[in-house]
Amino acid sequence: MTKIRIKNFGPIKQGCPDDDGWIDIKKVSVFIGNQGSGKSCVAKLISTFTWIEKALVRGDYAISDFSAVKFRKTYCGYHRIANYFFNNAHSDAAEIEYEGEAYSMKYQKGDFQISEKQSRKYFLPQIMYVPAERNFISIIKEAKSFKSLPDSLLEYITEFNNAKDEIKDGLSLPINDAEIKYDKQHDVINVTGSDYQVELSEASSGFQSLVPLYLVSYYLANAVRRQVENPQKMSHNESQRFNDAVKSIWADTTLTDEQRRIALSAVSSQFNKTAFINIVEEPEQNLFPVSQRNMLYSLLEFNNYSAENKLVIT
């Protein structure tokens, strides 16, 4: 089973008091606690490590590409937790370990080690981190113009845009007997009920939080399920073109690390995903208790599409 152990990272000091500090990442993992207690830290680290493991398995990167500095500044910086490694004395005291299905990783006080497991059964996942700031999506169309937005939110906006393009006749929501329809001509999502229609940007805060979460989760869960049910193997020529594209990306010295990551992810999307790891911050955000329950039931339904899917929520 995949698991993680964390000490001296941001608000997390001694870590989990049980099982020698290890936290199992089960099919459904729920992190509950007071505000500022480190719930999101755990979720963001799980997201980071699962992405690195996926990139290594897929061949996007080699182990040697992940130095301690790059892990801290680039990959943890993606989730804006790069400064969580340092205590009040500006000393790096963080201790983080991750045991995945294919790789083990350990960060300890400035040193980062990765080792490959000999015996493994790995299911290539579609990983989605759902930030708490997702309600901004309802009112922002050109996210790229907002340079201060978190990278995780920018990536979520990309998936949101992909998902809304897949809405055909409408998509029923799990609350209020409502549904959403996408007006492609005006690039507007409308929330409709039995006797009303309103643009998402003008809808209640509950709809503005729920629609991005539900739509992207629905879209990705079904996309992965289709790939599992109808796997497509690359032909010899397609495989050769893929290898050539990867080599070309690595040879391009003008690319930044982030640009290279995006390019490799785009090329590697040809691989069939066989699992969906949905990491959700605050699924209950701005929702009435009955609506919270219905949203949770939907997330659990998507998670049950495959035995290999995982749901992590804070």
Regions found by a protein language model. Give the residues of each.
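P-loop NTPase switch/coupling surface
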Residues: M1-Q185, T192-G193, A266-Q270, N304-N309
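Switch/communication elements of ASCE P-loop NTPase nucleotide-binding domains
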Residues: M1-K54, D195-T314
